[in-house]
Amino acid sequence: MQVPGEVNPRWELSAVQKRLEVDRRLPVLQFQKVVGSTMPVISNLFASKTHLALALETTPEKVIPRFTDAQVNGLAPRNVKSGPVKDVVLAGDNVDLNVLPIVTHCEKDAGPYLSSGVTIMRDPVSGSLNAGIYRNLVTSPTTLTMNMAPLCHGSEIAADAEKAKHHVEAAIVVGHHPALAISSQQRGQRSELELNTMGALLEEPLDMVPAETIDLPVPADAEIVIEGRIRTDAWADDGPFGDYWLYYAPPKPARIFEVTAITHRRDAIFHDIFSVGPEHLTLFSLGMEGVVFSQLKQLVPDLIAINVPVCGSGNLVYVQIRKGLDGQGVNAAIAALGAYRFKCAVVVDEDVDINDDGKVLWAMMTRTQADRSIFMIPGSYVSRVDPTGYPAWQTGNEGAPLLSTRLGIDATKPLDPAFPEVAEPPRELWTNLDLKRYLK
C-alpha cells in the first residue's frame, strides 16, 4: 500500500502503522514522502506468517520447515567486486545518520531507533560471519547504541573482544531481500552461519562486496549499509524503548557503535520495523519456532506443528500433536516449556487450527479441567524485560536473573470413546467447497 502524503518519522509514521493494526489491516506500507529525508520508508514486511510465506515463495505452514531445512543445508556467500550498495558512499566528514529516515515509534522512546538493521560481525573464535538484529538508538550524527541481549551471539563476540582489549568491526544492513532478516533470527550455536541460511532460502549465494572502512564483506545488493565499530570500552544509556512485550523497556547501558561510513543505493528504500507492532513479534517469534520445532520433534514423535502467536508477545506457544496415548499432551507441554523460555504452552489435537487463537481458546474451554489439565513450574528463567519477573536473589538486585512461574495446559481431548464428537457438516464437503459456485 502506497502512502503518498508526507509523514513525520517522529510518531506520525508509527501512528499510521498503529491505526491500521487496530483496524486489523496489515498491508506492506511504503511511505513515499518522509520529513527530513529523500528516502521512502517501507514497513510491515513481516507482519504475519502470510507475509513471511510470500517472501519465501511458499505457504504459511511450510515457513518453519523451510527455515529449519535451510539451516541444515546452507549455501555459502560469494564475493563480487561491486554492487548497488556502492552507488553512494558517505565517509569521513560526510558521515551523517540524519540522511536516513530513522523512526521514533513510541511517545516515550528515548529518540529515533534503527529497528530493522541486521548487524554483521566476524566471530574472532571461528572466523565466520555472524548476523543478528539489535536495536540502535541514534545518539549523534555519527554514533548509535548497540543494544544486545546478554546471551545473544553478538554480545558474546563483543565480550570476547573486550577481554582481548580490541573493538569489534561491524556493518548494519538496512534493507535487503526479506530472507536476510529471516535468517538473522536463527537460534542455536554461535558457530551457525546465518548468511549461509539466507543463501539456502534464496537458492543462490548471497553476493558480498568489501566494505569501505572496515575489514568485512557486506551484502552487495543491500539498500543501505552502515559501517563502523562497536566500542568495547565505552557504554551509553539506551531507553526507554517500546519493546515486543508492548511495554517500555527501562533505560539500560548499551555498547556504543561509531559510524565510519554509510553506503547505499542511489534509489535506496529504508526498512523500518514498528517496534510494538506485529512485524516485530512475527519476525522475532520465527527464530523461536525454528529451534523449538527441531527440539520438540525429537522429544515428541507425534508433533505436527507449533505456533508462537503474536498475542503472546513471544511468551506463548501452541503445540499441535497427533495424540495416541493419554498423558502425551502433558509431556508435550513440558518439552515445549523446556525448549525455550515460554511462560505458557498450550497443547491441542490435530483438529484444532493453531494459527487461529479463537480455536485454541475453544479447545481450552471445552477439553480441559483446571485440576487435571493445567500445571505450573515455578522458579524458571524468563526474559530480562518481563515486567512480572522477580529477581532470583533478592528484591531490587539488578544483577539477579529474572524468574517466573511457567504454565502448561493440556487442551487435548481424552481418548475415552465416550467423549463427544465435534458437530459440523461433513468435513470433506466444506473443506473442498468452491464458494464461487454459491456467492456472487
Features from the language model and the residues they span:
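Extended, highly charged
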Residues: 1-256, 261-440
